[in-house]
Swiss-Prot record:
InterPro entries: EF-4, EFG_III/V, EFG_V-like, EFTu-like_2, G_TR_CS, GUFP, LepA_C_sf, LepA_CTD. Keywords: Cell inner membrane, Cell membrane, GTP-binding, Hydrolase, Membrane, Nucleotide-binding, Protein biosynthesis. Its EC number is 3.6.5.n1. One of its GO terms (biological process) is translation. GTP binds at D19, H20, G21, K22, S23, T24, N136, K137, I138, D139. It comes from Synechococcus sp. (strain CC9605). Belongs to the TRAFAC class translation factor GTPase superfamily. Classic translation factor GTPase family. LepA subfamily. It is an enzyme of class 3 (hydrolase). It is found in: Cell inner membrane. Its main location: membrane. This is Elongation factor 4. GO terms for cellular component: plasma membrane. It catalyses: GTP + H2O = GDP + phosphate + H(+). Required for accurate and efficient protein synthesis under certain stress conditions. May act as a fidelity factor of the translation reaction, by catalyzing a one-codon backward translocation of tRNAs on improperly translocated ribosomes. Back-translocation proceeds from a post-translocation (POST) complex to a pre-translocation (PRE) complex, thus giving elongation factor G a second chance to translocate the tRNAs correctly. Binds to ribosomes in a GTP-dependent manner.
Length: 606
């Protein structure tokens, strides 16, 4: 049934926090509508990557078309557009929301509203979506649907009288959800006769067919014989095929306004078919593109280096291929005195960084060294110019710069109020400015802080979860740059600057961080046959130092008794050799040492 009238199409997505049962609910909807046969069913059906199933998160968007017969006997087409729930992927979420008219807000009936759910709900409200609250996991012993309804009403302002209780695990409440989608989500605008415009909401790279683009037709129609124009990249393509996801791909001849489908057109790279771009026809182009297209800006940067120098071309190929399916990943070549050739990569956030690293190691079989993540600093120079620095090692000299500004975020933390003190302590340690505190219910509180992004990208999230036994959740948004007393902290190993260990820290914290860093490196760097000094410096001033003592080789082992002058000669020769070794010797710094920079907070540093 591909020729469904617009009035019988419903496009919707599911908004939920990680672990609140979004993928399980999607599985049940596919099963209940007969879209996926029971024998083909596997958990998290729409999460294609192994990594997604393992971590239990949705990274890339998927879409599925379901045929559904409503209670009054009419047939409908329901397009479910799956969305990632994590804050790093909010741009992916905003595009998928633009392709929908409604959203199921899934809230865990035992845990309540979480911060990232809220962020996505606000995005949905911005897009004028009809929101249907669903209380999931009501079969759990700790479920308290009435309290959660009150919470949703208090925090989001949604009327929860007709919230649907369900259990995605057992299938309870799923038929009611499908009926509610038909009854409450508005049909798409009937714009079949208007000029063709389609919104790209996802794309992925297929090694055989090039880029496969997922799109929603907003107006007009697209035929499999058309020639299309992508309005942001200004590129034109002959279509190879178009089709629908059911949820496996099925070819069709034509898709009209309101429908969701995919196209293949031998597109070489995902960057040519960017998410949020508008597809139109070459022979009858639309006057203007659909609103809301922005390029995803990387927020967190780190260096990626292969452990073996000859793997550099492989890493470049892997990044090229990964960028085909991940347009938010940015990278450029970089050389480091300590690590040789590698790449400086930009990511949307820490989770995005971890996932890219894991995919490179898994899918492309690479061994990588990853440097500590950093953010983009704005450096005001004495000559009046501005320099943006994403690599601490390239920070201009103190004599040339007037001030350094760093990005700040506004953070909202939701938690049970018994953890208030622990969270305020954490935010203060991280140079946070207290803004406000609101009680949502009698036992849940929202803390609002403004703090530097650099303090968030290391292990803020882990620390927050640890100090609140996993009960707190957070979301943050960028609010601009602020001046701070920042300095560059260098690490010298055996007198050589290890640029991969360079960090930018606040002046007041520099001594503690430096001290903790050299002590940590002393534990992690293996001993050599010569003494290795490890120093932390700001400019030319050494602020902390320690050294790794040499392994002593017993050169006198062969001298049984014998002449003292013979022993002296051997010891002198050894001392000479050590001197030469020290001058020539390269110290291998293990990967753990680079990661130690991240984890310094455990050692009372940054």
């Amino acid at each position: 049934m591909t020729d469904a009238p617009v009035s019988r199409i419903r496009n919707f997505c599911i908004i939920a926090h990680i672990d609140h049962g979004k993928s399980t609910l999607a599985d049940r909807l596919l099963q209940d509508t007969g879209t996926v046969a029971n024998r083909d069913m596997q958990d998290q059906f729409l999460d294609n990557m192994d990594l997604e199933r393992e971590r239990g998160i949705t990274i890339k968007l998927q879409a599925a078309r379901m045929n559904y017969t409503a209670a009054h006997g009419e047939e409908y087409v329901l397009n479910l557009i799956d969305t990632p729930g994590h804050v790093d992927f909010s741009y992916e979420v905003s595009r998928s929301l633009q392709a929908c008219e409604g959203a199921l807000l899934v809230v865990d009936a035992s845990q309540g509203v979480e911060a990232q759910t809220l962020a996505n709900v606000y995005l949905a409200l911005d897009n004028d979506l009809e929101i249907i609250p669903v209380l999931n996991k009501i079969d759990l012993p700790g479920a308290d649907p009435d309290r959660i309804k009150e919470e949703v009403e208090a925090i989001i302002g949604l009327d929860c009288d007709n919230a649907i209780p369900c259990s995605a695990k057992t299938g309870l409440g799923v038929p009611e959800i499908l009926q509610a989608v038909v009854d409450r989500v508005p049909p798409p605008k009937d714009a079949v006769e208007e000029p063709t415009k389609a919104l790209i909401f996802d794309s992925y790279y297929d090694p055989y067919r090039g880029v496969i683009v997922y799109f929603r037709v907003m107006s007009g129609r697209i035929n499999c014989k058309d020639k299309v124009l992508l309005m942001a990249s200004k590129k034109t393509y002959e279509l190879d095929e178009i089709g629908i996801m059911a949820p496996d791909q099925k070819k069709v001849d034509e898709l009209h306004a309101g429908e969701v489908g995919y196209l293949a057109a031998s597109i070489k790279a995902v960057a040519d078919a960017r998410v949020g771009d508008t597809i139109t026809l070459v022979n009858a182009p639309a006057d203007e593109a659909l609103p809301g297209y922005t390029e995803a800006k990387p927020m967190v940067f780190c260096g990626l280096f292969p452990t073996e120098a000859d793997q550099y071309p492989d890493l470049r190929d892997a990044l090229d291929k990964l960028q085909l399916s991940d347009a938010a990943l940015k990278y450029e070549p970089e050389t480091s005195s300590a690590m040789g050739f590698g790449f400086r990569c930009g990511f949307l956030g820490l989770l995005h960084m971890e996932i890219v690293q894991e995919r490179l190691e898994r899918e492309y079989d690479l061994d990588l060294i990853v440097t500590a993540p950093s953010v983009i600093y704005k450096v005001n120079m004495i000559d009046g110019s501005e320099v943006m620095v994403d690599n601490p090692a390239t920070l201009p000299d103190p004599q040339k710069r007037e001030s350094i500004e760093e990005p700040y975020v506004r953070m909202e933390i939701y938690a049970p109020n018994e953890y208030n003190g622990a969270l305020m302590g954490l935010c203060q340690e991280r140079r946070g400015d207290y803004i406000d505190m609101k009680y949502i219910t009698t036992d849940r509180v929202t803390l609002i802080y403004e703090l530097p992004l650099a303090e968030v990208v290391t292990d803020f999230f882990d620390q927050m979860k640890t100090r609140t036994q996993g009960y707190a959740s957070m979301e943050y948004s960028l609010i601009g740059y602020r001046k701070n007393q920042l300095v560059r902290l260098d690490v010298l190993i055996n007198g050589e600057r290890a640029d991969a260990l360079t960090t930018i820290v606040h002046q007041d914290k520099a001594y503690n961080v430096g001290k903790a860093l050299v002590e940590k490196l002393k534990e992690l760097i293996p001993r050599q046959q010569f003494k290795i000094p490890i120093q932390a410096s700001i400019g030319s001033r050494i602020i902390a130092s320690t050294s790794i003592s040499a392994i002593r080789k017993d050169v006198l082992a062969k001298c049984y008794g014998g002449d003292i002058s013979r022993k002296k000669k051997l010891l002198k020769k050894q001392a000479k050799g050590k001197k030469r070794m020290k001058a020539m010797g390269k110290v291998d710094v293990p990967q753990e040492a680079f990661m130690a920079v991240l984890k310094l907070n455990d050692g009372g540093g940054s």
